[in-house]
Amino acid sequence: VQAALPAHPITTQYRETDWAFVTRLLAEAGLAWRYAHAQDADSQATAATLVIFDPQAQAPDSGTIRFHRSDLAEADDAIGAFGERRGVVPTTSTVTSWHSEQVRAVGAQAQAEAGALPPLEVYVQPRAGRFAQEATAQDQAQARLDALRVPHTLHAGAGSARVLAAGAAFTLRQHAQHDGQRFVPVAIEHVAVNNLGQGIVALLDAPELEHGSYRNRFLAVPAATPLRALPQDRPRMPGPQSARVVGVADAALSPSRDHQVRIQFPWQRGDQPTPGGLTDSASTAPGHAPGDQRAGTWVPVAEWVAG
């Protein structure tokens, strides 16, 4: 990852699995991920490493794969079917967020070539104060547009190429239309049949599979396509939430200019959690529960005299 990632005032995992929580944060940051599988030559153990990358990262190279039939008489693996499909996707992404300290809306817009189609815009307005400057908004607009445009050109293929790996680029040869072009698989389905004759071919309803053979099918995009994940909606907390107002020790409570105070939730762990809370079991870096002005985030205060 080469891009600088912003720090959030508070990040909460609520009613979502660890995997859903982590991938949601990665998608919000405009990042993608893949698994790198490795096996030690001296053992039967295998290892899978989660690799996180941005569009500037260079994809691993799976080499050259020819477009040819796949059968037992062939010495090399090949791709036996390879097609292309196009989809109508947005061409413009606009994000805007009101920034109370700057008394203005901070936003940006990213655009892509529309061709003969009319402009198709996606407009997103996140919470207030989401962007401190236009550069951050521009990064978010571009990341969302890149994620929305991944399905613009998809290639569906099938064959026996065992070197294919999601996120790793390959060069296609001997194809009438795509010879010499590079592609990156984004999804692969593997089917391997052993030679023990246990009727797996009949169970899979795939008579084209021979005993002791391997086949796959995959979806790929052109290698120049920026790979990003589309941000997903975060779970919502229904009803009110209790919290404690925090600030500078032994000092009067000082709200912000916009009548906001800083709060610390009881489920935040740290050195000084609220009564009933737990101490931090991992990092004690700022942002957990220090019990002072560094905790949590600013929230507006509603009073009965508010207009």
Locate each region found by the language model.
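Amphipathic alpha-helical and helix-coil boundary elements used as assembly
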Residues: 1-307
